[in-house]
């Protein structure tokens, strides 16, 4: 996040927190976000555990296991400590003294020891080797070395991946945890993943500064409530008390018009700019954003409105 801040010092920046199972790590990430000049914290509710993604499973697609996409963590001092603790504990066996185990432990055991079961043979495949090299290449963040050879020999790069997979999320997240975030940062808190008006009410009662209606782009549950269906009820429940951000399924400017007309304060995009990035890099992202804004402008004109403030339910008709 510090590198992003340096690259775009004048831009508005939000830090999206995936609530880790380590509170020390959560606190560290939020402190870094505030120190780097972020304007608000987005607490993610829609991915407290990963959904059943059959295509990802079929393709064995999880870049995190290759050390990709975890730079926010490998640049964190608390995460570094977790990684080093993991490597120090690797291979160690917890031993308990006889006195601690009680009198029964002092009796002689005449049972012959069982032969240790042999470990299954390790099969090195080209894909496994390639994955190991990728992890090593990303390992400089935790080893401090840019030498591929040293990173291949070090246990830290692999331990970083294992640590990330272990602490990345917590299914046990509750409403009470929001109070911790207030202790860790003074930045405004946006709650992302609201699709039910009752949850919007609870969010307001918890004192959040904004609500983000999202189903994580439909990636978590195929049969999830469409965010556009959730927006009107949530907007009525919020009643203008806090801003509402909207995403999931937005592909063009006309989608933005509909969301704004139904009460969204702001609209976020995900896949469209990723498509542009994949096709043409930075220029592709710029073109996608330009096209969305152009379609937004033209759609408003065709609907007979001249400003976003004029957009309301009156410009829509239920199909």
Cite the ranges covered by each PLM segment:
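A general structural detector for well-ordered alpha-helical segments in enzyme core domains, enriched
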Residues: 4, 29, 177, 227-234, ...
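Receiver (REC) domain switch/active-site residues of two-component response regulators
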Residues: 39, 209, 265
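Terminal peptide-recognition signature
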Residues: 43, 181, 211, 259, ...
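Active-site entrance/lid segments in N-terminal catalytic domains of soluble metabolic enzymes
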Residues: 1-201, 205, 217-220
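Alpha/beta catalytic cores of nucleotide-metabolism and tRNA/nucleoside-modifying enzymes
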Residues: 119, 147, 229-246, 251-319
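Histidine- and/or cysteine-centered catalytic micro-motif in compact active-site loops
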Residues: 194-196, 216-218, 226, 249, ...
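Short, ordered loop/turn segments at secondary-structure junctions
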Residues: 46-48, 216-218, 271-274, 304
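Extended hydrophobic/aromatic segments used for targeting, binding, or gating
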Residues: 2, 10, 204, 209-246
């Amino acid at each position: 996040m510090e590198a992003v801040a340096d690259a775009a010092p004048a831009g508005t920046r939000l830090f999206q927190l995936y609530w880790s199972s380590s509170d020390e790590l959560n606190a560290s990430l939020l402190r870094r976000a505030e120190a780097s000049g972020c304007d608000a914290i987005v607490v993610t509710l829609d991915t407290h555990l990963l959904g059943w993604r059959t295509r990802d499973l079929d393709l064995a697609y999880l870049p995190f296991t290759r050390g990709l996409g975890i730079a926010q963590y490998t640049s964190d001092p608390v995460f570094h400590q977790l990684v080093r603790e993991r490597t120090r504990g690797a291979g160690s066996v917890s031993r308990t003294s006889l006195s601690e185990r009680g009198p029964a432990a002092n009796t002689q055991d005449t049972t012959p020891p069982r032969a240790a079961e042999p470990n299954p043979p390790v099969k090195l495949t080209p894909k496994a080797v390639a994955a190991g090299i990728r992890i090593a290449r990303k390992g400089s963040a935790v080893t401090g070395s840019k030498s591929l050879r040293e990173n291949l020999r070090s246990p830290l790069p692999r331990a970083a991946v294992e640590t990330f997979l272990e602490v990345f999320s917590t299914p046990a997240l509750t409403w009470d945890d929001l109070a911790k975030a207030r202790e860790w940062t003074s930045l405004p808190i946006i709650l992302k993943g609201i699709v039910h008006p009752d949850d919007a009410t609870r969010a307001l009662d918890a004192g959040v500064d904004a609500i983000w209606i999202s189903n994580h782009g439909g990636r978590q549950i195929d049969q999830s409530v469409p965010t556009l269906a959730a927006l009107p009820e949530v907007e009525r429940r919020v009643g203008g008390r806090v801003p509402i951000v909207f995403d999931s399924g937005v592909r063009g400017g006309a989608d933005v018009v509909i969301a704004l007309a139904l009460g969204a304060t702001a609209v976020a995009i995900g896949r469209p700019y990723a498509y542009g990035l994949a096709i043409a890099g930075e220029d592709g992202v710029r073109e996608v954003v330009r096209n969305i804004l152009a379609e937004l402008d033209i759609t408003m004109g065709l609907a007979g409105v001249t400003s976003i403030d004029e957009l309301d339910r009156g410009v829509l008709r239920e199909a």
